Swiss-Prot record:
Its EC number is 5.3.1.23. This is Methylthioribose-1-phosphate isomerase. GO terms for biological process: L-methionine salvage from methylthioadenosine. Substrate binds at R58, G59, A60, R101, Q204, N255, K256. The lineage of its organism: Bacteria, Pseudomonadati, Pseudomonadota, Gammaproteobacteria, Lysobacterales. InterPro entries: IF-2B-related, IF-M1Pi, IF_2B-like_C, Initiation_fac_2B_a/b/d, M1Pi_N, NagB/RpiA_transferase-like. The record marks C165 as: Transition state stabilizer. The active site is at D245. Catalyzes the interconversion of methylthioribose-1-phosphate (MTR-1-P) into methylthioribulose-1-phosphate (MTRu-1-P).
């Protein structure tokens, strides 16, 4: 029953946030959804970096894919006889792309992958870049579909689930990570009810996740972030399913701010907690969450909703974008390599140590 053949991808996988046209990267502008469906055209690597920083494109896998195409765009501005010479000239552009969002490891991973293939490329280095960028996108989509099947298999039929932020097609090459599990679970009739937290301050849950599910014909119920513990106490959800921006060697997981408190509440109420992310999100070089740089964004993002100020002048705000959930609060980490139950350093090493 967990076979991906049971999933109608024509229904559950038709949204695409990135489109490479051959001469530019078209990004579905996620700052304007759900009311305006508009694309941002990026024809330089710096335009891609700005789109990543400004959240026109967001989600750890999606920004890694965007960065790959950003390298392809940067390559147009230089001349080099081989990949190694090109890499030296491209390094400033790669550094600017990497600085756009510091917490998500997929961004650095994608750029390191581009460096590796460039360093070994000959005179055809431009074609090598384009092939590698496309491969990053193709592999992400395949991984998401596989993770969807693996994660759905953990869910008992009739379950309710709660998700946080946006981890669907908009955050990936397609189908999604945590939302991919939910899509697969709905397709297999394992999930009876979906709840989504609004995810302040950017409202990714309210603006993006419930919109995505609506496009698929999936009935989702939006809740205020502050209602999550009460929802768990009610018995309406059996799983919290989230994505990740970085998973450490001991299972500690950085994800959208608010994830940590969901994990604490889930453990208290006997609700299972699942993290879904491709292996590119796993950072075995980072021993624990204490070593993760947590991105801080403009405090002004907390001062209003939808462009309307709701806070008095002169108020200070603290606006971390991510938090770290300890591995011992996570029941399962799902990647395309398999399921790591009760993740700890030994289990993570066994799965990803090579």
């Amino acid at each position: 029953m967990n076979d991906s053949a049971h999933i109608d991808y024509a229904r559950y996988d038709h949204i695409r946030p990135l489109l490479w046209t051959g001469d530019a990267l078209e990004l579905l502008d996620q700052r304007k959804l759900p009311f305006v469906v508009e694309h941002v055209r990026c024809d330089t690597s710096d335009a891609v970096a700005e789109a990543i920083h400004s959240l026109a494109v967001r989600g750890a896998p999606a920004i890694g894919i965007a960065a790959g195409w950003g390298v392809a765009l940067a390559a147009r501005d230089i001349a080099a006889d081989d990949g190694n010479a090109a890499l030296q000239k491209l390094e400033p552009a790669l550094l600017r792309l990497n600085a756009a969002r510091p917490t998500a490891v997929n961004l650095a991973w994608a750029l390191m992958r581009m460096r590796r293939v460039l360093g070994a490329a000959g005179a055809d280095w431009r074609a090598v870049i384009a092939r590698e960028a496309q491969a990053i996108a193709d592999e992400d989509l395949a991984a998401n579909r596989h993770m969807g099947a693996l994660g759905a298999a953990l869910i008992a039929p009739g379950s309710g689930v709660l998700t946080h932020c946006n981890t669907g097609s908009l955050a990936t090459a397609g189908f999604g990570t945590a939302l991919g599990v939910i899509r697969a679970g709905m397709a297999q009739q394992r999930i009876a009810k979906v709840f989504a937290g609004e995810t302040r301050p950017w409202l990714q849950g309210a603006r993006l996740t419930v919109w995505e599910l609506q496009q698929d014909g999936i009935d989702a119920t939006l809740i205020a972030d502050s209602a999550a513990s009460h929802l768990m106490k009610s018995g309406l959800v059996q799983w919290v399913i989230v994505g990740a921006d970085r998973i450490c060697a001991n299972g500690d997981t950085a994800n959208k701010i608010g994830t940590y408190q969901l994990a604490i509440a889930a453990r208290h109420h006997g609700v299972k907690f699942m993290v879904v992310a491709p292996s590119s999100t796993v950072d075995m070089a980072t021993a624990s969450g204490d070593q993760i740089e947590i991105e801080q964004r403009d405090p002004g993002e907390l001062f209003g909703v939808g462009g309307v100020r709701t806070v008095a002048d002169g108020i200070h705000a603290w606006n971390p974008v991510f938090d770290v959930t300890p591995g011992d609060l996570i029941d399962a980490i799902v990647t395309e390599r398999g399921v790591i139950a009760q993740p700890d350093q030994a289990r993570m090493q066994a799965a990803f140590g090579n």
